[in-house]
Amino acid sequence: MNYIKKILALLMLSSSLSLIAQDMVVYNTTAGNLSSVIPADELKELREVKLTGTVNAADFFFIRDNIKEAKTIDMSEVQIEACEVSGVSYAANEIPANAFYEPYASTGLSRLSTFYFPLSVESIGENALYQSIILRTTNLAELPVLRIIKAGAMSRCTRLREVELPASLEEIGAAAFAHNSQLSDVTIAPESQLRLLGKNAFNGCIKLSSLDFSATQLEEVGEQAFNACSILNSVLLPASVKYIGEEAFMYTSVNQIDWSHLVGLRVVEGSMFYGVGTLNSVILPHSVEQIKASAFALCSGLSTISLPYHLVAIGDWAFANCTSLRTIVCPTPIVPQVGYLAFQGVNTSAVEVQVLESVLPLYENDADWGYFRLKGDAFTGISVGEHQDLQVCRRYGNVEIVSPIAIKSVAIYAYNGTMLRQERIDNMQAIIELSATEHCIVSIAFVDGNIRVVKL
């Protein structure tokens, strides 16, 4: 009797192993012919599929519309050829737009948990894997020539927990990983070529706590890139960043910002840190000229901020309801213009503002700054990259400048901080016509990101 039971058990095990072995079905195809390769009666039964050979956009759409029960699709060994479908051209080596997402039905491949991209893929098209709601595993890290992940390509993949981006990647499109509610780990390969992070790229990734872009060549961070990443407390950016869009860090949990190395950044855009109650300390690069509306509004934990040396204007409501603010370091040689209700809800009499001793009287007589506790400081330790052999002189109603390196721009201010004019320069010598004002301050921005201010 025991012998018979053992035989039956072995037969059952053999049958199970046979079924497992048959789960992964391999089809070799040529571009545009997948529909004729897979028998119609097998389509609904396919769970594990591997393709070899060549495919095109038509084959992706065939999979989307007919192999809806697939859990694993392995296309790592296929080549994608260019084609035209319904009058739309699709490029070679690109996962086509809406590859596995049906826009009219607003559904993706709802059972797809593992997808292996072709190793030759260079671009992942818009909404390619949008709303693949149980997708967990991909081979993104193994794609040696991937350059672009386009808008919405892997958005609302609500089971995706980890993403590893290859070094070849140059651009992450708008909302490419937005609203991936389980995404907690994003790894970027060393020596990354990443230059552009599109708007809303990681918007709503509520389990993402940190991001490190410091090893990339990132230049631009789009609007709302990290908006509503509610536990995101650390984002490291490289010195190459020149632009960060509005609301980029809105409703995150960032606690400290030190952007002193971002020498190409000129503007802190509107509502950039709006509602970030955890933010307590901010250091901005001296290259910043403007802080726009509501940039730090409702940052209730912000206690200290170091303003840039070259700051000209603070926008409306920029620091509204920063109720913990106690120290502002403001080493500018001019008095920055303050917008409407810029410090609304701030107890200005409790805030110490450290300013240059030479311009302290201007702050004391200013309608906006006069309400703060003002303190003169020599700022002897501040470094703004002065070029010692710079020659600036006033002659014949002009300001004449001779520089050791190329100049990016020159701004002329009156002593009260009013900008008289600004000129864009692209050489090492400049003559700027001067208005009738008796005295002026010349602010020179160099192409290397340094700044020099000269009082005449």
Regions found by a protein language model. Name each.
Residues M1-D23:
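Bacterial Sec-dependent N-terminal signal peptides
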Residues D23-T29, R47-V55, A70-N93, A105-S123, ...:
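Structural signature of tandem-repeat unit edges
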Residues V78, V85, M419-T437:
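Glycine-centered tight-turn motifs at strand-turn-strand junctions
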Residues N98-A99, G125-Y130, K150-A153, G173-A176, ...:
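Consensus positions within tandem repeat domains that build extended binding/scaffold surfaces
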Residues G376-Y396, P404, N450-I451:
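Residue-level detector of functionally pivotal "anchor" positions at catalytic/ligand-binding pockets or at interdomain
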Residues S403-K408, T437:
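Short proline/glycine-enriched turn/loop motifs at strand-loop junctions of beta-rich domains
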Residues Y413-L420, C440-V442:
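Short, glycine-anchored, charge-dense loop/turn motifs used at functional sites
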Residues H439-L456:
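C-terminal tail/sorting-segment detector
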